[in-house]
Each structure stands twice: as structure tokens, then as C-alpha cells.
Amino acid sequence: MNQVIAEPMSTKNILFLTNTLRKKFNLYDCTYFPIVEFIETVLPEIDPKFSYLYVDKAEMPDTYAYFDNETKVMVIREDVYEGALNGSGRDRFTLAHELGHYVLHSSGVQLCRSDGGRVVTYCDPEWQANTFASKLLMPDHLIYTLTPSEISKEFGASYQAAEIALYKAKKAKLAT
């Protein structure tokens, strides 16, 4: 089975990147990251090669969104876009995940295929993009003292994503 492998990246490094991004755009202490506005407005300004495209669900019935790192085009299903605009935690996470692929895997980072064996977690581009999405939408420094319900409401995340983010943030804090 072919598997895609990315350059190694730890949770700590990904958190550093998401916090740096938030600081650069004066969003460090913002609880509700404006993911749609960031993709539609900020990315095209900072990278003229980046573009996005909304497609009908019938065109991509089994895919919510994807980022093509060769063309730098993010393709998003219209229902996912509308869900993100309306605050759906799952859809906001999907867009943040694709932003993660853009940030982590489009600027000279080589993805390669492997012919077997298990890919270690920190080299898995999907794990990296999920971690990026979680840390971008629910940064550790803002969620430590909250409950999953509070995180879900204040940060626009699903309850399940909030539970996982809080568990990992507390675990990381204990490790330091």
C-alpha cells in the first residue's frame, strides 16, 4: 500500500507555527478564529499564487475539501463552506485542516510515497494537518481552564474536537 510521508513535525513545532500565525495577524488571544475570512481574504493577499474554489457537492460527493499543493488551489465543497460560515465546528475544522496542508506542505516540503510499513505519526501529513487545525482553532494557552462545552461554543469547534484538544493540551502542560 502506498502511503504519503511528510517531513517530521512535532506537536510542539506545529503549535509554535499556529501561535506565530495568530500573532502575525493579531489573533493570538482571539477565541473564534475567522477561518473563512482568512482563506478568502488573507491568503490571497500574502500569496498571489494561492486560490480557492467552491464546488457543488455532486462534484465531490466523498470529499469535503482538498488542497492541491502543486497548483496551490484549495477546493471546498459549497455545503462545507456554508457550514463553516454558519459556525459548524466540523466544517470550520475541515477548512483549518486544509489550511494546515497549505502552511505545512506547500512551500518546498516534499511529500513522498512509501511502499509499506507504518508511517510514524509525526511524518503523516494528515495527522500534521489535523494537529494544525486543532491548535489553530483551539490554542492551548486559551483552553486550559475551560470545559469541552465552553471550548465548543467559544471557539466554534465540535464537542468531540474540543474534548480531544483539551485532553492533549492538559497532557502537554503536565509534560513540561
Where are the model-predicted features located?
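Active-site hotspot residues in diverse enzymes, especially metal/ion-binding acidic/histidine motifs
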Residues: 1-176
